[in-house]
Protein backbone atom coordinates (compact mmCIF):
# COMPACT_ATOMS: atom_id res chain seq x y z
CA UNK A 1 0.00 0.00 0.00
CA UNK A 2 2.96 2.32 0.56
CA UNK A 3 3.86 2.08 -3.13
CA UNK A 4 0.29 2.84 -4.18
CA UNK A 5 -0.12 5.82 -1.84
CA UNK A 6 3.24 7.21 -2.95
CA UNK A 7 2.26 6.99 -6.62
CA UNK A 8 -1.13 8.57 -5.93
CA UNK A 9 0.51 11.45 -4.07
CA UNK A 10 2.78 11.95 -7.08
CA UNK A 11 -0.20 12.28 -9.42
CA UNK A 12 -0.72 8.73 -10.69
CA UNK A 13 -4.16 7.12 -10.76
CA UNK A 14 -4.27 3.57 -9.41
CA UNK A 15 -6.81 1.28 -11.08
CA UNK A 16 -9.20 -0.17 -8.49
CA UNK A 17 -9.68 0.72 -4.84
CA UNK A 18 -8.80 -2.65 -3.33
CA UNK A 19 -5.73 -4.71 -4.09
CA UNK A 20 -3.50 -7.32 -2.51
CA UNK A 21 -0.03 -7.60 -4.05
CA UNK A 22 -0.48 -6.01 -7.49
CA UNK A 23 -1.31 -2.50 -8.63
CA UNK A 24 -1.97 -1.11 -12.12
CA UNK A 25 -1.71 2.47 -13.29
CA UNK A 26 -1.11 4.59 -16.39
CA UNK A 27 2.48 5.68 -17.04
CA UNK A 28 4.84 6.40 -19.92
CA UNK A 29 8.58 6.57 -20.57
CA UNK A 30 9.47 4.10 -17.84
CA UNK A 31 10.67 0.99 -19.67
CA UNK A 32 14.31 1.86 -20.37
CA UNK A 33 14.85 3.27 -16.90
CA UNK A 34 13.26 0.26 -15.20
CA UNK A 35 15.45 -2.20 -17.11
CA UNK A 36 18.53 -0.13 -16.33
CA UNK A 37 17.63 -0.48 -12.64
CA UNK A 38 17.06 -4.26 -13.02
CA UNK A 39 13.27 -4.10 -12.74
CA UNK A 40 10.80 -5.88 -15.01
CA UNK A 41 7.28 -4.45 -14.82
CA UNK A 42 4.31 -5.72 -16.77
CA UNK A 43 3.52 -3.69 -19.86
CA UNK A 44 -0.12 -4.21 -20.87
CA UNK A 45 0.52 -2.44 -24.17
CA UNK A 46 -2.00 0.38 -23.72
CA UNK A 47 -0.01 2.62 -21.41
CA UNK A 48 -1.01 0.55 -18.39
CA UNK A 49 1.78 -0.82 -16.21
CA UNK A 50 1.45 -3.54 -13.57
CA UNK A 51 3.69 -4.00 -10.53
CA UNK A 52 3.58 -6.95 -8.12
CA UNK A 53 5.30 -7.02 -4.72
CA UNK A 54 5.90 -9.90 -2.33
CA UNK A 55 7.29 -10.57 1.14
CA UNK A 56 10.87 -10.08 -0.07
CA UNK A 57 10.23 -6.48 -1.15
CA UNK A 58 11.99 -3.92 1.05
CA UNK A 59 11.41 -0.21 1.57
CA UNK A 60 14.60 0.39 -0.38
CA UNK A 61 13.09 -1.55 -3.31
CA UNK A 62 9.98 0.61 -3.15
CA UNK A 63 12.07 3.78 -3.21
CA UNK A 64 13.94 2.54 -6.28
CA UNK A 65 10.68 1.61 -8.00
CA UNK A 66 9.30 5.06 -7.28
CA UNK A 67 12.46 6.58 -8.72
CA UNK A 68 11.64 4.94 -12.06
CA UNK A 69 8.41 6.95 -12.14
CA UNK A 70 9.94 10.13 -10.64
CA UNK A 71 7.84 9.71 -7.51
CA UNK A 72 8.73 10.17 -3.84
CA UNK A 73 8.15 7.82 -0.92
CA UNK A 74 5.05 8.65 1.10
CA UNK A 75 5.57 7.73 4.76
CA UNK A 76 1.97 8.57 5.64
CA UNK A 77 -0.04 5.72 4.15
CA UNK A 78 -3.11 3.75 5.21
CA UNK A 79 -3.73 0.04 5.07
CA UNK A 80 -5.32 -1.31 1.89
CA UNK A 81 -7.20 -4.17 3.58
CA UNK A 82 -10.69 -3.00 4.65
CA UNK A 83 -11.57 -3.39 8.32
CA UNK A 84 -14.29 -5.96 7.61
CA UNK A 85 -11.67 -8.29 6.09
CA UNK A 86 -9.10 -7.98 8.86
CA UNK A 87 -8.96 -11.16 10.94
CA UNK A 88 -10.31 -10.72 14.44
CA UNK A 89 -10.19 -14.31 15.68
CA UNK A 90 -7.21 -15.99 17.31
CA UNK A 91 -4.75 -17.96 15.21
CA UNK A 92 -2.12 -20.65 15.89
CA UNK A 93 -4.21 -21.55 18.92
CA UNK A 94 -3.43 -25.29 18.91
CA UNK A 95 -1.20 -26.31 21.80
CA UNK A 96 1.45 -27.66 19.42
CA UNK A 97 2.45 -24.06 18.67
CA UNK A 98 3.23 -23.23 22.30
CA UNK A 99 4.26 -26.44 24.11
CA UNK A 100 7.79 -26.75 22.67
CA UNK A 101 9.60 -23.86 24.32
CA UNK A 102 13.25 -24.87 24.08
CA UNK A 103 15.52 -25.82 21.21
CA UNK A 104 15.88 -29.34 22.64
CA UNK A 105 12.12 -29.83 22.91
CA UNK A 106 11.65 -28.61 19.35
CA UNK A 107 14.45 -30.87 18.09
CA UNK A 108 12.90 -33.92 19.76
CA UNK A 109 9.44 -33.07 18.47
CA UNK A 110 10.71 -32.75 14.90
CA UNK A 111 12.58 -36.05 15.22
CA UNK A 112 9.39 -37.70 16.47
CA UNK A 113 7.60 -36.48 13.35
CA UNK A 114 10.48 -37.65 11.19
CA UNK A 115 10.17 -41.20 12.54
CA UNK A 116 6.57 -41.30 11.30
CA UNK A 117 7.63 -40.51 7.75
CA UNK A 118 7.70 -43.29 5.16
CA UNK A 119 10.69 -42.47 3.00
CA UNK A 120 13.41 -44.04 0.90
CA UNK A 121 15.71 -44.50 3.91
CA UNK A 122 13.18 -46.87 5.54
CA UNK A 123 11.07 -48.32 2.73
CA UNK A 124 9.91 -48.10 -0.85
CA UNK A 125 7.45 -45.26 -1.43
CA UNK A 126 4.26 -46.92 -2.74
CA UNK A 127 2.76 -43.85 -4.42
CA UNK A 128 3.35 -44.31 -8.14
CA UNK A 129 6.25 -44.38 -10.53
CA UNK A 130 7.12 -40.69 -10.13
CA UNK A 131 7.85 -41.11 -6.41
CA UNK A 132 9.57 -44.50 -6.51
CA UNK A 133 12.95 -43.08 -7.35
CA UNK A 134 15.73 -41.12 -5.69
CA UNK A 135 17.10 -37.94 -7.23
CA UNK A 136 20.85 -37.74 -6.90
CA UNK A 137 22.28 -34.68 -5.16
CA UNK A 138 23.94 -33.65 -8.42
CA UNK A 139 20.46 -33.45 -9.96
CA UNK A 140 18.88 -31.58 -7.06
CA UNK A 141 21.59 -29.01 -6.37
CA UNK A 142 21.30 -26.98 -9.62
CA UNK A 143 17.65 -26.24 -8.78
CA UNK A 144 18.89 -24.05 -5.93
CA UNK A 145 21.21 -21.98 -8.12
CA UNK A 146 19.79 -18.45 -8.48
CA UNK A 147 20.56 -18.49 -12.21
CA UNK A 148 17.79 -21.11 -12.49
CA UNK A 149 15.52 -20.48 -9.53
CA UNK A 150 15.36 -16.67 -9.48
CA UNK A 151 14.23 -16.16 -13.08
CA UNK A 152 10.64 -15.01 -13.51
CA UNK A 153 8.65 -17.13 -16.01
CA UNK A 154 7.58 -13.98 -17.86
CA UNK A 155 11.08 -12.48 -18.07
CA UNK A 156 11.74 -10.81 -21.46
CA UNK A 157 13.25 -13.14 -24.04
CA UNK A 158 16.39 -11.02 -24.42
CA UNK A 159 17.18 -11.60 -20.73
CA UNK A 160 16.91 -15.40 -20.73
CA UNK A 161 18.99 -16.52 -23.70
CA UNK A 162 20.58 -19.32 -21.69
CA UNK A 163 17.20 -20.72 -20.67
CA UNK A 164 15.95 -20.71 -24.26
CA UNK A 165 19.10 -22.51 -25.40
CA UNK A 166 18.60 -25.14 -22.69
CA UNK A 167 14.91 -25.57 -23.55
CA UNK A 168 15.51 -25.78 -27.30
CA UNK A 169 18.39 -28.25 -27.01
CA UNK A 170 16.45 -30.48 -24.61
CA UNK A 171 13.41 -30.31 -26.87
CA UNK A 172 15.43 -31.34 -29.92
CA UNK A 173 16.84 -34.33 -28.04
CA UNK A 174 13.42 -35.46 -26.82
CA UNK A 175 11.97 -35.23 -30.32
CA UNK A 176 14.86 -37.29 -31.67
CA UNK A 177 14.61 -39.90 -28.90
CA UNK A 178 10.89 -40.45 -29.35
CA UNK A 179 10.63 -40.29 -33.14
CA UNK A 180 8.29 -37.30 -33.37
CA UNK A 181 8.60 -33.95 -35.18
CA UNK A 182 7.70 -31.19 -32.70
CA UNK A 183 7.42 -30.53 -28.98
CA UNK A 184 5.69 -28.23 -26.50
CA UNK A 185 7.37 -27.77 -23.12
CA UNK A 186 4.34 -26.05 -21.62
CA UNK A 187 2.45 -28.80 -19.73
CA UNK A 188 3.39 -29.09 -16.04
CA UNK A 189 2.49 -32.75 -15.60
CA UNK A 190 1.48 -35.90 -17.41
CA UNK A 191 -2.21 -35.21 -16.80
CA UNK A 192 -1.83 -31.69 -18.17
CA UNK A 193 0.07 -33.18 -21.11
CA UNK A 194 -2.90 -35.47 -21.79
CA UNK A 195 -5.24 -32.49 -21.82
CA UNK A 196 -2.90 -30.48 -24.08
CA UNK A 197 -2.51 -33.39 -26.50
CA UNK A 198 -6.24 -34.03 -26.74
CA UNK A 199 -6.97 -30.32 -27.23
CA UNK A 200 -4.37 -30.32 -30.00
CA UNK A 201 -6.22 -33.23 -31.64
CA UNK A 202 -9.53 -31.40 -31.31
CA UNK A 203 -8.02 -28.32 -32.96
CA UNK A 204 -6.74 -30.53 -35.79
CA UNK A 205 -10.22 -31.94 -36.44
CA UNK A 206 -11.77 -28.47 -36.25
CA UNK A 207 -9.29 -27.17 -38.84
CA UNK A 208 -10.41 -30.02 -41.11
CA UNK A 209 -14.08 -29.08 -40.61
CA UNK A 210 -14.67 -32.23 -38.58
CA UNK A 211 -15.53 -30.70 -35.22
CA UNK A 212 -18.20 -33.38 -34.79
CA UNK A 213 -15.40 -35.85 -33.97
CA UNK A 214 -15.68 -36.03 -30.18
CA UNK A 215 -15.49 -39.74 -29.29
CA UNK A 216 -12.42 -40.97 -27.41
CA UNK A 217 -11.76 -44.71 -27.07
CA UNK A 218 -10.00 -45.60 -23.81
CA UNK A 219 -9.11 -49.13 -22.56
CA UNK A 220 -10.55 -50.24 -19.22
CA UNK A 221 -6.95 -50.68 -17.99
CA UNK A 222 -6.18 -46.97 -18.41
CA UNK A 223 -4.98 -44.65 -15.67
CA UNK A 224 -7.79 -42.55 -14.21
CA UNK A 225 -6.41 -39.32 -15.61
CA UNK A 226 -7.07 -40.54 -19.18
CA UNK A 227 -10.89 -40.37 -19.10
CA UNK A 228 -10.73 -37.25 -16.92
CA UNK A 229 -8.55 -35.46 -19.49
CA UNK A 230 -10.81 -36.56 -22.33
CA UNK A 231 -13.88 -35.18 -20.56
CA UNK A 232 -12.09 -31.89 -19.87
CA UNK A 233 -11.17 -31.68 -23.55
CA UNK A 234 -14.85 -31.91 -24.43
CA UNK A 235 -14.82 -35.52 -25.60
CA UNK A 236 -17.15 -38.42 -24.85
CA UNK A 237 -15.45 -41.52 -23.48
CA UNK A 238 -16.16 -45.00 -24.85
CA UNK A 239 -14.48 -47.76 -22.84
CA UNK A 240 -12.73 -50.63 -24.65
CA UNK A 241 -12.55 -54.01 -22.90
CA UNK A 242 -9.32 -55.77 -21.88
CA UNK A 243 -8.61 -59.49 -21.44
CA UNK A 244 -7.50 -61.22 -18.24
CA UNK A 245 -3.84 -60.44 -19.02
CA UNK A 246 -4.47 -56.71 -19.36
CA UNK A 247 -4.25 -56.67 -23.17
CA UNK A 248 -6.70 -54.57 -25.16
CA UNK A 249 -9.45 -56.71 -26.67
CA UNK A 250 -8.73 -56.16 -30.37
CA UNK A 251 -12.15 -57.38 -31.48
CA UNK A 252 -13.97 -54.99 -29.12
CA UNK A 253 -11.58 -52.18 -30.08
CA UNK A 254 -12.18 -52.57 -33.82
CA UNK A 255 -15.91 -52.94 -33.28
CA UNK A 256 -16.18 -49.67 -31.35
CA UNK A 257 -13.79 -47.79 -33.66
CA UNK A 258 -15.92 -48.84 -36.64
CA UNK A 259 -19.17 -48.09 -34.82
CA UNK A 260 -18.02 -44.52 -34.10
CA UNK A 261 -16.05 -43.95 -37.31
CA UNK A 262 -18.10 -40.84 -38.22
CA UNK A 263 -17.25 -39.06 -34.97
CA UNK A 264 -14.13 -40.82 -33.67
CA UNK A 265 -11.71 -38.16 -32.42
CA UNK A 266 -8.96 -40.11 -30.68
CA UNK A 267 -7.86 -43.22 -28.88
CA UNK A 268 -5.77 -43.06 -25.73
CA UNK A 269 -3.37 -45.90 -25.11
CA UNK A 270 -0.75 -46.33 -22.39
CA UNK A 271 2.30 -48.24 -23.62
CA UNK A 272 3.36 -50.24 -21.75
CA UNK A 273 0.02 -50.27 -19.97
CA UNK A 274 -0.73 -49.64 -16.32
CA UNK A 275 -0.60 -53.44 -15.93
CA UNK A 276 2.95 -53.44 -17.30
CA UNK A 277 1.77 -55.01 -20.56
CA UNK A 278 3.42 -54.25 -23.90
CA UNK A 279 0.53 -54.45 -26.36
CA UNK A 280 1.80 -56.75 -29.16
CA UNK A 281 -0.76 -55.21 -31.52
CA UNK A 282 0.15 -51.56 -30.91
CA UNK A 283 0.74 -50.83 -34.61
CA UNK A 284 -2.48 -52.53 -35.67
CA UNK A 285 -4.45 -50.55 -33.07
CA UNK A 286 -3.01 -47.31 -34.43
CA UNK A 287 -3.91 -48.33 -37.98
CA UNK A 288 -7.49 -49.13 -36.97
CA UNK A 289 -7.81 -45.71 -35.32
CA UNK A 290 -6.46 -43.91 -38.41
CA UNK A 291 -8.62 -45.95 -40.80
CA UNK A 292 -11.66 -44.72 -38.87
CA UNK A 293 -10.63 -41.06 -38.86
CA UNK A 294 -9.18 -40.89 -35.36
CA UNK A 295 -5.85 -39.75 -33.97
CA UNK A 296 -3.70 -41.73 -31.54
CA UNK A 297 -2.70 -40.32 -28.15
CA UNK A 298 -0.09 -42.31 -26.24
CA UNK A 299 0.23 -41.91 -22.49
CA UNK A 300 3.99 -41.84 -21.95
CA UNK A 301 3.89 -42.34 -18.18
CA UNK A 302 5.76 -45.64 -18.50
CA UNK A 303 8.11 -44.53 -21.26
CA UNK A 304 11.13 -45.39 -19.13
CA UNK A 305 10.56 -49.06 -19.97
CA UNK A 306 11.12 -48.62 -23.71
CA UNK A 307 12.77 -45.29 -24.56
CA UNK A 308 16.20 -46.90 -24.93
CA UNK A 309 14.85 -49.58 -27.27
CA UNK A 310 12.38 -48.00 -29.68
CA UNK A 311 10.70 -44.78 -30.79
CA UNK A 312 6.94 -44.46 -30.15
CA UNK A 313 6.71 -42.18 -33.17
CA UNK A 314 7.29 -45.25 -35.33
CA UNK A 315 4.29 -47.12 -33.91
CA UNK A 316 1.75 -44.84 -35.58
CA UNK A 317 1.23 -42.60 -32.55
CA UNK A 318 0.32 -38.96 -33.34
CA UNK A 319 0.95 -37.26 -30.00
CA UNK A 320 2.37 -38.34 -26.64
CA UNK A 321 3.36 -36.80 -23.34
CA UNK A 322 6.65 -37.46 -21.57
CA UNK A 323 6.93 -37.42 -17.78
CA UNK A 324 10.38 -35.87 -17.48
CA UNK A 325 10.27 -36.35 -13.70
CA UNK A 326 9.94 -40.10 -14.30
CA UNK A 327 11.69 -41.21 -17.47
CA UNK A 328 14.46 -38.61 -17.47
CA UNK A 329 14.90 -38.26 -13.71
CA UNK A 330 14.68 -34.48 -13.44
CA UNK A 331 14.29 -33.18 -9.84
CA UNK A 332 10.86 -34.02 -8.46
CA UNK A 333 11.34 -34.97 -4.83
CA UNK A 334 8.32 -37.22 -4.28
CA UNK A 335 5.59 -34.80 -5.21
CA UNK A 336 7.19 -31.53 -6.27
CA UNK A 337 6.64 -29.75 -9.59
CA UNK A 338 6.71 -32.01 -12.63
CA UNK A 339 7.04 -31.60 -16.38
CA UNK A 340 4.82 -33.30 -18.97
CA UNK A 341 5.81 -31.92 -22.39
CA UNK A 342 4.03 -33.31 -25.43
CA UNK A 343 5.69 -34.45 -28.64
CA UNK A 344 3.72 -34.82 -31.85
CA UNK A 345 3.86 -35.53 -35.55
CA UNK A 346 4.22 -32.68 -38.03
CA UNK A 347 0.52 -32.48 -38.96
CA UNK A 348 -0.34 -31.55 -35.35
CA UNK A 349 2.58 -29.20 -34.70
CA UNK A 350 0.80 -25.99 -35.70
CA UNK A 351 -1.86 -26.62 -33.06
CA UNK A 352 0.51 -26.91 -30.07
CA UNK A 353 -0.20 -24.55 -27.12
CA UNK A 354 0.59 -20.86 -27.41
CA UNK A 355 1.18 -18.31 -24.64
CA UNK A 356 0.61 -14.58 -24.31
CA UNK A 357 4.19 -13.93 -23.14
CA UNK A 358 5.85 -15.36 -26.26
CA UNK A 359 5.11 -14.92 -29.94
CA UNK A 360 3.70 -17.95 -31.74
CA UNK A 361 4.20 -18.48 -35.48
CA UNK A 362 1.00 -20.53 -35.63
CA UNK A 363 -2.35 -18.77 -35.62
CA UNK A 364 -4.10 -22.12 -35.12
CA UNK A 365 -2.37 -22.84 -31.79
CA UNK A 366 -4.61 -23.83 -28.89
CA UNK A 367 -4.64 -21.44 -25.89
CA UNK A 368 -2.17 -21.84 -23.04
CA UNK A 369 -2.60 -24.91 -20.83
CA UNK A 370 -0.18 -23.65 -18.16
CA UNK A 371 0.41 -20.34 -16.41
CA UNK A 372 4.03 -20.22 -17.62
CA UNK A 373 5.12 -20.60 -21.26
CA UNK A 374 7.55 -23.44 -20.52
CA UNK A 375 5.90 -25.03 -17.49
CA UNK A 376 8.14 -25.69 -14.49
CA UNK A 377 11.22 -24.65 -16.45
CA UNK A 378 13.51 -24.32 -13.41
CA UNK A 379 13.72 -28.12 -13.14
CA UNK A 380 14.61 -28.77 -16.77
Mark where each language-model region is:
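Conserved C-terminal alpha-helix-loop-beta "cap" of PLP-dependent enzymes
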Residues: 2-68, 73-80, 107, 113-118, ...
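Conserved PLP-enzyme active-site core in the AAT-like
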Residues: 7, 20, 24, 161-162, ...
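Flexible inter-domain linker/hinge segments
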Residues: 59-126, 130-138, 143-149
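Short acidic-aromatic active-site loops that bind/stabilize oxyanions
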Residues: 96, 156-168, 187, 243, ...
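Conserved phosphate/anionic-ligand binding catalytic regions in large, soluble enzymes, centered on
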Residues: 52, 56-57, 118-139, 186-197, ...
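Structural motif of enzymes handling amino- and sulfur-group chemistry
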Residues: 1-13, 366-380
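Gly-rich Lys/Arg/Thr-decorated short loops/hinges at beta-loop-alpha junctions or inter-strand turns
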Residues: 14-17, 86-87, 145-158, 176, ...
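Conserved N-terminal alpha-helix of the aminotransferase class I/II PLP-enzyme fold
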Residues: 6, 102, 148-188, 193
Amino acid sequence: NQLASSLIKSGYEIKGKRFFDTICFKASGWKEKSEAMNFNFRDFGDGLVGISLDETTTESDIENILDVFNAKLNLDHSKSIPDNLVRGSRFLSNSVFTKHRSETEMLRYMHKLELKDLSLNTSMIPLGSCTMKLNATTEMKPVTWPEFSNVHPFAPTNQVGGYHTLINELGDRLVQLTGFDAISMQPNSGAQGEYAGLMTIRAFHKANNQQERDICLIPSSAHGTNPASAIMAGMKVVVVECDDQGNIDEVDFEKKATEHRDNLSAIMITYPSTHGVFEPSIKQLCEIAHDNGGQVYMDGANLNALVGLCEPGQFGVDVMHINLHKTFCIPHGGGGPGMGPIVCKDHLSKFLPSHTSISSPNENSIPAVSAAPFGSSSIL
